[in-house]
Amino acid sequence: MAQPRIPRDLLPSDPRFGCGPSRIRREVVASLSEPGSVMGTSHRQPPVRHVVAAIREELTELYNLPTDYEVALGNGGATLFWDMATVSLVEKRAATGVYGEFTRKFSSALQRAPFLADPAVFQAEPGELALPEAVSDVDTYAWAHNETSTGVVAPVRRPNDIDDNSLVLVDATSAAGGVAADMSTIDAYYFSPQKNLSSDGGLWLAILSPAAIERSNRVTSSARWVPQMLDLSLAVTNSRADQTLNTPALATLVMLEAQCRWLLDQGGMAWAASRTASTSGTLYRWAEDNPLTTPFVADPALRSPVVVTIDIDESVDAARLCARARDNGILDIEPYRKLGRNQIRIATFSSIEPSDVEALTACLDWLLENRD
C-alpha cells in the first residue's frame, strides 16, 4: 500500500538540506553554460586567472583580512590540506582538539607522520568541545571552527600562553562563508568550498598569515622530503600568480567566485552569519518544542549555526524518517554515518532560504504525526 504523501503546499521550494555537497543556487549552475563562460578554456590564460584573482580578492574583503595575509588555493580539498599542513607547517609536534570525526582525521594524519612526535590530543565526546591548550614542546595548534559530523561550533582565537612562534590552524570547511571569524590572531583558516560557499569539492583554500607562509618556506626547504602536491610554499607561489599547481575544475572556481560575490552583495559576513544564526535557530527551537526531538548538542553556546544535529526519540526510527522524507523529495537530512545515533542532521548554510527551513519543520511535523 502506498504511503501517504506530504501535502505539496508544505514542501520547501528547494528540498536540498545536505551538509555537503551543499545547495548551489540554480542561477549559478545555469551560468556555466552561458555564452562567454570560461568552461573549456585554459586555466593558464587570463579569463580563468581573473576568476582566481576575484576569488582571492573577494575572500580578502569578506573576512576583512589584515593587509599582509594571503589567500592560497590548490587541488585536493581540505583532506589534502591536512597532509599538506602535516608536512609543510608542523615542525616537530602539534596539539589538536578532537571532538568529532573530522577533527579526529587531522589528528590521525599527524599521528601517522614518521617525522613528527605524536600530537598532544585534547579530546571530548561527540556533541562536546575540547580545544588544545599550551604545551611546552608544541609548535602548531589545530582544531575545527565547525565540526561537521556533530554540529559543534568552536571559537577562533589564539590559545592562551602558547609560544609566540607557534602556529594556529583552523579547519573552516563547514564554517567558511557562514560563521564569522577574526583572522588576525590565527595563521591558517582553511576550507573546501562545497558548503556555505556553494561550490563543488576537490579544491582547498587557505587564508594564511605571514608566519604560516614563512614556516612553510622554511620547512619545505629543509631536509624533509615534501611532495609537490603537499608543498604549501609552492601553492602560495602559484596562487600569487592566480593559478594552481595543476589543472583545477573550472566549474568549481566559477561557482565559488559567484557565491563569494553574492555574499558580498548581500552584506558580507555580517549578513551571512545573521542568516545562518536565524535559520539554525528555527530548527533548534523546533527541536526543543517537539516532544519527540532534542538538540544533540546540549550546550546552546556550542550549537552550530550551519550544521544542526537533532536527536529523535527512540519511539521513532530516524532512518525510516529520513527515508520517508527522501521519498517525498526532501534530501540529505541523514545523520553523519559514523556517529551511529538516532538523529537527523540538517544544513543551514548561507544559500538555504529561511522559508525553506520553516517549511522543513512543517514537513517533519507531518511525517512524525503520520509515521507508520
What annotation goes with each model-predicted range?
Residues 183-194, 204:
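Conserved active-site segment immediately N-terminal to the catalytic lysine
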Residues 1-42:
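N-terminal "arm"/small-domain region of PLP-dependent enzymes with the aminotransferase-like
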Residues 89-102:
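Conserved PLP-anchoring active-site segment centered on the Schiff-base-forming lysine
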Residues 14, 338, 342-372:
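PLP-dependent enzyme catalytic core of the Aspartate aminotransferase-like
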